[in-house]
Amino acid sequence: MTTVRVKENEPFDVALRRFKRTIEKIGLLTDLRAREFYEKPTAERKRKKAAAVKRHFKRVRSMQLPKKLY
């Protein structure tokens, strides 16, 4: 469980921002959204494989030289 201690004379907004940052860093919200609905194991594998292919092609595309624009 994540805890954020509010310091003396610290505004609530600053403490809330620190809390949100720690929640984002540990990936709690993304994990909760992923577990919100049941996903079949085959669907999960298919989604992860598609994401890996997309990352691969994105990496390959970024390594290519840009086309000449003339």
Curated annotation (Swiss-Prot):
Instruction: Write down a Pfam family by its short name.
Output: Ribosomal_S21
Q: Which UniProt keywords apply?
A: Ribonucleoprotein, Ribosomal protein
Q: Which PROSITE patterns match?
A: RIBOSOMAL_S21
Question: Cross-referenced InterPro entries, in alphabetical order?
Answer: Ribosomal_bS21, Ribosomal_bS21_CS, Ribosomal_bS21_sf
According to the UniProt entry, its GO molecular function terms are: structural constituent of ribosome
Q: Which GO terms describe its cellular component?
A: ribonucleoprotein complex; ribosome
Q: What are the coiled-coil residue ranges?
A: none
For the keyword Acyltransferase, the answer is no
Biological-process GO terms, alphabetical: translation
Q: Which family does it belong to?
A: Belongs to the bacterial ribosomal protein bS21 family.
Q: Report the protein name in the record.
A: Small ribosomal subunit protein bS21
Organism per entry: Methylibium petroleiphilum (strain ATCC BAA-1232 / LMG 22953 / PM1)
**What gene is this protein translated from?**
rpsU
